[in-house]
Amino acid sequence: MARYRNKVSCPAQCDPKLQSTGDTSWDSYATTMKTAFTPKRGMVPDLIRPKSTRRLGFTYSIGDPILNESQYHDEYTWKLRSKENMVKTGTSRGVWNHKTHPGQEFFQWTHPKGKQTQKLPWIEPPSEESIQNAVASQFISCTKRDFVDLTQSKKTMKRFPRSQDRKSLLPRPLDTEFRYNYQIPAQIPELKDFSFKYGCYASLPVASQGLVPSVLSSYIRNEERTKKQTTYECDYGKACLDFLTILDSFTPSQVHDYLQSVSYKDRQILERFIHSHCDIEAKPNKREKQSHRKRP
């Protein structure tokens, strides 16, 4: 094993790039970013502002005295006209050439000989009438300028043929718009006949005329329901009172006391009714007893 260990060479000895440079502060975990882009060391020179360009600033430096000039004053103030470079007839070699051909702007145009020059119309002095009209036109009102006189407008209207307005030919009612739209509706005479009393005409006080249908059972039932005073009587009430149920609700002593307090005639009538009621109850009891006797 020791032999093989001696034969194995170190990668730093084979690759010259990986050989140690004597720097003891070597970081084994350094990234490519750190090795390729090393931090700058040393003094960084001051940035010099160029004076030839206007975009990066003014031509003066910070230490110079501040005059009454700014970028706005430098760009937007009135400046003197720059002197144009005169055309030099000499060449680059310094030889003067007298046969120059200047441009057309150097020529001075004149009229041909024998032709009389006419005065321009705006150079002639104005007459008194034109001056008076110009002064008078300044005092014309807006209404007179915008709205023409009626007499003048009528003359202009008579020249053109007038088109007939069709709306004016339509017949118009004499009533107002409200009366025309909200007038009494036309009544049909056939609908005024109230000889029948059905539907909405059932409550009219006018007597019905003509044929009347036969009375139905539903009409009778409705009339009977209208006679009742309350809904309870209509649903749960009976046509006659059941006196037998009333008598059964009292005890014999109460009935006897009541008969003593009533007059003699009323007492006889009530006693007859009570005896008849007792006979009605006694007859079914006797029949039940006889049936029980026959069975055994």
From Swiss-Prot:
Chain positions covered by the region annotation Mn 4: 175-189
Region described as Mn 2: 69-83
Matching InterPro entries: MEDAG/TEX26
Location of region: Mn 5: 229-243
Mn 1, as annotated region: 30-42
Region span, Mn 3: 140-153
PANTHER family: TESTIS-EXPRESSED PROTEIN 26, TESTIS-EXPRESSED PROTEIN 26 ISOFORM X3
Protein name as annotated: Testis-expressed protein 26
Native source organism of the sequence: Mus musculus
Gene name for this UniProt entry: Tex26
